[in-house]
Amino acid sequence: VAWDGNVVASLSATGQPGFRIFGADAQALRGKLESAGAIPATAGEVRTVRIENGRPRYGDDIFETSLPQETQQMHAISFNKGCYLGQEIVERIRARGHVNRKLVRMEIDAREVVSGAKVVAGGAEVGDVTSAVWSPRSGKTVALGYVRVPHCEAGSSVEVGGASAVVF
């Protein structure tokens, strides 16, 4: 939508309702929005809300090799559209199979968790963390990560870096 010489799009990086505004003079636009009562968010705040809401980000949580069924982003796939790169494997999984891991949100009883930390259940490695951040709202670290399907159910208990964690 055109607005005051800019383009406004309903896009959310956090999983909450949001907008992206594209324009030539970002400083002037920011000043107008702040004078109208808008409160700017830092990149760190946006990242925290994104992870708290389980919203994956390409490059952090979704990769070139990720399958839509793993990332739980099926709303982004059309099974009625013509050919596209990767269609055969995506359709084969939908029609006959399943994935072995899924991207899930976790809350971890630890102050700091790094990307790449291993997720463990019953003494065996069952996944890894892709994004993690301390959540002031929950008082825990919230994280996104790929976890093997048997441990993906909400409420499943796992460990990350030796700390207790729960899948949501």
Question: Would you name each region that the model predicts?
Answer:
Residues V1-P56:
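Acidic, low-complexity central loop/insert segments
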Residues D4, D25, D60-D61, D109, ...:
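Acidic-enriched, low-complexity/disordered segments with a strong bias for Aspartate over Glutamate
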Residues N6, Q16-F19, A24, D60, ...:
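Intrinsically disordered, low-complexity regions
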Residues F19, L29-L33, D61-F63, E88, ...:
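A short secondary-structure junction signal
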Residues E34-G37, P56, I62-F63, A76, ...:
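A near-ubiquitous, low-amplitude feature marking generic local secondary-structure context
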Residues V49-T71:
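Short, conserved active-site entrance elements at the starts or edges of catalytic domains
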Residues T65, T71-I77, K81-Q87, E91-F168:
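Glycine-rich, small/acidic residue-mixed loop/short-helix segments
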